[in-house]
């Protein structure tokens, strides 16, 4: 009887344990889900279930513990990834910061170099210290060399910036040729003034003023020569003309003969005209006290006129033979004025002829 009771009690205990295990089984499933999500609390409850392995569910409980360990590994990998991301972000930020600092230092230096390259007067090759430096005016006798030195001073880059829009497409050789043509037209004096900084218009005005003063002095000298020659001719030949005017009808022929003689005398060498002494201009003398002198001059002039008429075949002989002996009649004021005008006209005509002869020579 005791044996049967003990077996019954054992069976009851087993059934109660199985019922307790069956009741605990639905609690293990949410524990696995919580363990797979990485929560350590689910893993701990699964570990508690592992203590019930005495009922033969050891394998199941072992799987529960494994799920807990898997959750812990998943959580650790996510932490490592987040740390790696943080490291990458810090590395990228440090690299970008260093690049920004480098650009801050590099860009100003590049800008300075470009600015200096654009605005500097230095050209390729630099300055040759072996060649002695001389001013541009030193080469004024050789205009071609002076132009070459000017182009070396300015340089090709700066010249291209200085050129107007019309000459932008021209080459350096064409520009040099144009400059050479313009330079040949300028005098050395004007080039020196331009190099000294004087205005070109001022130099042109000065040159025109110099030319005008020269022309004015030439005109004044010609007028002086004309006046001197007219006065000398008038003083020397006036008495003869006065007495010839007193003739009856042949006065014009006599005056024409005298005019040819005066022209031949005036057209002589210029040196003789310059060397001729300037006689005082006392052309009008008193009428009463000069009658005897007039008679002598009349006789002399008549003889000269007769000699000229015989020597010139073109003149008619009747003109010289028809001159009557002069009478003692004083010339009128109108005759004197006409004679003076005629003498001046002859002197001007002779000077014009002399100037025409000098020009071809």
From Swiss-Prot:
Protein's UniProt keywords contain Transferase: no
Region of interest called Disordered, as start-end residue ranges on this chain: 1-28, 67-100, 198-218, 230-331
Pfam families tied to this protein: CAAP1 (PF15335)
Keywords: Apoptosis, Coiled coil, Isopeptide bond, Phosphoprotein, Ubl conjugation
Sequence ranges of Basic residues compositional bias: 1-14
Tissue: Ubiquitous.
Composition bias, Low complexity: 19-28, 272-281
Compositionally biased tracts (Acidic residues): 199-210
Residues in cross-link Glycyl lysine isopeptide (Lys-Gly) (interchain with G-Cter in SUMO2): 104
GO biological process: apoptotic process; negative regulation of apoptotic process
Coiled-coil intervals: 281-311
Positions of post-translational Phosphothreonine modification: 90
Biased composition range(s): Basic and acidic residues: 234-251
Residues modified as Phosphoserine: 89, 120, 203, 312
Role noted for this protein: Anti-apoptotic protein that modulates a caspase-10 dependent mitochondrial caspase-3/9 feedback amplification loop.
Protein name: Caspase activity and apoptosis inhibitor 1
């Amino acid at each position: 009887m005791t044996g049967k009771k003990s077996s019954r009690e054992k069976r009851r205990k087993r059934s109660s344990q199985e019922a307790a295990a069956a009741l605990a089984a639905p609690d293990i499933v949410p524990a696995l889900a919580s363990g797979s999500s990485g929560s350590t609390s689910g893993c701990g409850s699964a570990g508690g279930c592992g203590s019930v392995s005495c009922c033969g569910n050891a394998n199941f409980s072992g799987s529960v513990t494994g799920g807990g360990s898997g959750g812990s590994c998943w959580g650790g990998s996510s932490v490592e990834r987040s740390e790696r991301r943080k490291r990458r972000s810090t590395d990228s930020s440090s690299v970008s910061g260093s690049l920004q600092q480098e650009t801050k230092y590099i860009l100003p230096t590049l800008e300075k170099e470009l600015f200096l390259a654009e605005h500097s007067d230095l050209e390729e090759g630099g300055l040759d210290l072996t060649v002695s430096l001389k001013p541009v005016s030193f080469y004024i006798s050789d205009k071609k060399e002076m132009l070459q030195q000017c182009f070396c001073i300015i340089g090709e880059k700066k010249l291209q910036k200085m050129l107007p829009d019309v000459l932008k497409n021209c080459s350096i050789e064409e520009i040099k040729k144009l400059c050479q043509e313009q330079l040949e037209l300028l005098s050395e004096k004007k080039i020196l003034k331009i190099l000294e900084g004087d205005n070109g218009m001022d130099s042109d005005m000065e040159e025109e003023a110099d030319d005008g003063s020269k022309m004015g002095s030439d005109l004044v000298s010609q007028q002086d020569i004309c006046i001197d020659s007219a006065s000398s001719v008038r003083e020397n030949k006036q008495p003869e003309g006065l007495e010839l005017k007193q003739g009856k009808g042949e006065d014009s022929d006599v005056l024409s003969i005298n005019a040819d003689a005066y022209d031949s005398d005036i057209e002589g060498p210029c040196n003789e005209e310059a060397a001729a002494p300037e006689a005082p201009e006392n052309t009008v003398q008193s009428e009463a006290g000069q009658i005897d002198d007039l008679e002598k001059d009349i006789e002399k002039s008549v003889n000269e006129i007769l000699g000229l008429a015989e020597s010139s075949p073109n003149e008619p002989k009747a003109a010289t033979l028809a001159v009557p002996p002069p009478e003692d009649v004083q010339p009128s004021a109108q005759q004197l004025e006409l004679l003076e005008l005629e003498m001046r006209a002859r002197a001007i005509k002779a000077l014009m002829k002399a100037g025409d002869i000098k020009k071809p020579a």
